[in-house]
A protein has these predicted regions:
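Short, well-structured alpha-helical segments in soluble
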Residues: 60-67
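Sec/Tat signal peptide C-region and signal peptidase I cleavage site
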Residues: 14-19
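Extracytoplasmic ligand-binding site segments that recognize negatively charged/polar headgroups
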Residues: 27, 31-34, 56, 70-208
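C-terminal lobe and pocket-closing loops
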Residues: 206-220
Length: 220
């Protein structure tokens, strides 16, 4: 069995006339999602059975279950996870005119729809780093020798960083991105450790001047 990766809107247009419940696999863990599931059930009468786990765990389960899988929909994060699932044939093709009218073409494919987006930002401490310099920073600048031992970032195995590097490769090419990665490593204030929040806290504690982390970690 192949599954659909998309948002809740498509469930109301695709599943409402076929099933009294839908099995939703998700790697997200936010209360706002739960509220959406409740609203969907109230609007359609369709029960949402939620199975939560990290994406790699869900992917492994889907691949092992194959056509016997009970999953109907997957909600996960990051283009890296989407690319992996698409490449491994987990998704079935889907088309929704409703979603097509609401979601820009660069945030959807023949196999999935994007329902949320997040930015990977460069954080700084205004008490120790010039705001004037910071406002003009871009990812490429993180490899500038002037920031030697001033940058913190998660491990390269993290899917958020892998997606960031992929975007740099797409825009700057393999050669320039490889040189950039080496420069970034030279500028690290410490060996990569912890999640995105740990990088922000490192800047707040004065362990580094710059940190790379997703937007939503700032409020945690």
């Amino acid at each position: 069995k192949k599954v659909i990766f998309t948002g809740l809107f498509v469930l109301s247009t695709v599943c409402s006339s076929f099933a009294a419940e839908v099995n939703l696999f998700t790697s997200r863990h936010y209360s706002s999602d739960v509220e959406l599931y409740k609203k969907f059930t109230n609007n359609t009468g369709i029960k949402v059975n939620v199975i939560k786990a990290k994406y790699k765990v869900l992917e492994k389960r889907l691949l092992s279950e194959g056509k016997s899988s009970k999953a109907d929909v997957i909600i996960t994060v990051d283009a890296g996870a989407l690319g992996s699932a698409t490449k491994k044939g987990i998704f079935q093709k889907i088309k929704s005119e409703t979603l097509n009218s609401k979601i820009p073409s660069n945030f959807r494919s023949a196999h999935w729809y994007g329902i949320a987006k997040r930015a990977r930002l460069i954080y700084f401490n205004p008490e120790t780093f010039s705001p004037e310099v910071a406002k003009n920073l871009n990812y490429e600048d993180l490899a500038n020798p002037m920031f030697k031992r001033k940058v913190v970032i998660r491990k390269s195995s993290n899917v958020y960083n892998q997606s960031l590097v992929s975007s740099l490769v797409a825009n700057n090419g393999v050669s320039k991105t490889s040189k950039w990665a080496k420069g970034l490593v030279s500028n690290m204030a410490r060996k990569p450790k912890g999640n995105d929040r740990a990088q922000i806290l490192a800047v707040a504690a004065g362990e580094a001047d710059l940190a790379v982390a997703n937007t939503y970690y700032y409020a945690l």
